[in-house]
Every structure is written in structure tokens, then in C-alpha cells.
């Protein structure tokens, strides 16, 4: 299918499956905020323009007061959650995260969708405890769910080339498997267009499909295309994915991952119009208004959206807009 020129036919098949899984003509969005608590990282991924090494003049670790302010601003805008991630800081043990999460939960009623698989592995290593114990302790401290970041392409041949210091494929899967077994829901992602082959993408999708069959713990799948500006990988990947490539990939992902209920169409990397079209290529969710986003924006993504922008693009595509929470529950009166 990746080699097919029948874009409309592939899109129609994906839309047919989307209608089967979501028969009420609803498309969803969320109001939340990305909070990047630190940009210090030891991984130096070639596709990332966000990280700074420890000791760099632009390196930071946000104090609680800054994070609290960001959370309050999110709540004031009608937000329901924060997506909190950072670099792999070499000096922050699990106690630092436990204290932060507990203090947030004591002060705010908000969903904590926090820490990627590489971050959890980093915390486990620093703290000298198992992955399962790390997740259990973080869950007990206030972690509600885990984002799917750090997957990139789940094939070690690709990972060695673009992120050789980051966790390998099996390690990423092991974090999500452990989380699901502990009752913690997670999302799955794919960053494509970084020089991988079609076979690499299919391998990635098959691994996610197999894990979902095993655990049922993924709430959603979010694919996005590599943004090359200001990244070292951008010197080798000369062209970013086109809108046609995005829509075809989105549709194929929807068809392949028929056991993951929700698939997000991205406006952050592709813009609002392509995102809107994606609702007819298998997507049922348009993501967040993104009150704050620092990672892909530093790699060249420059799109922005308000809540009304997202509601309008959903209505204009023929769907009923519904605000959801991080776990894809739509109990809001809108």
C-alpha cells in the first residue's frame, strides 16, 4: 500500500474503518499543555533540536513554581491535563519525580500524562530499581498515563543511526508492556520520514499491533513526520514529508492498527488543512490546542491553533467536535 498511487482508495478504506470504530460522526480534541521540565539530555539524538548538554548556558530544570504556573494557566484555559516530558537528565532520581508529582496532585486537579519510555528507563537506571517498580512508584505518586514518545521508528537499524544512545526497540516495548500490566494506559507514536524504509515502518506497526493484542493498553496512536530544521539529521534528510505522504501514511496506520481505537491526525507538523483532511483518511482526533510546545517547534514546526480553530476545522469537515480528556473520554457538555 505504501507503494500504491491510489491515495483516494486507501483513504476511503481507512475512513470506512474509522466509521466502524467511531460510528457517531464525532471528532475529538483536547485542551492540554506540554510542560518540558528540563532540556538537559545525555542522548544527543540527531533529529532533536531541543536538548542541551548539562552545563550548557541554555540548560534548565524548571523549579516547582514555574511548573505550577504553567499548570494553573492550563486550567484557566479549560485544560484537563499536562503532557510533561523532558530530556534524560543524569542527576534526577525517582524521589525528585515522586515529590514533584505528589505536590502537583496536592495543589491541582489535573491529569498527569508524563514521562516517555526513555525517561522511565533513565530514572530506573539512576535509581537502581526495576522498570516495573519505577512505574509503580511514579503511578502511586500521581502519574496517570504515559505518552508514547521516544518510539521514533521501532527498528534497531534505524535507531542506531538516528538515536544510537537512546533505548532500543525491546526496551521501549518493555516499558509500555510493564505499564499496561500495572494498569497504566499509554499512547503509541511513530516519527517517520527520517530516512527509514517502508519495511521499517511496517515492522514498527506490527510490533505495536502485537503488543496491543497482548495487553490492550494503548489508548491511541499518533504518527507525525520528521521536522528537519536545526537538527543534525536534517543535513542528511534533505526533504520533509509531503502532505500526500502524510495522508497515505496516516491511512495505512489506521488500517494496520485496527486494534487501537483512536488515531490522531497531526496539525502541529502538517498544518490545519492537512489535519482536517486527515479526518477523512482514518483520523478521529485532532490532538491538542498545544498551549505550549517546545520540541517540534525548535525543529521547524510553526503552526498554531486555538480551541475555536480546532472546533471549526472539525465542523467544516462534517463532524461534531467534542472535547475529550487524556484517556479519550468525552463527557464534557460541548
What do the PLM-derived regions correspond to, one by one?
Residues 1-2, 31-34, 86-90, 192-195, ...:
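Conserved short loop/turn motifs at secondary-structure junctions
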Residues 11-54, 59-85:
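N-terminal pre-triad scaffold of radical SAM enzymes
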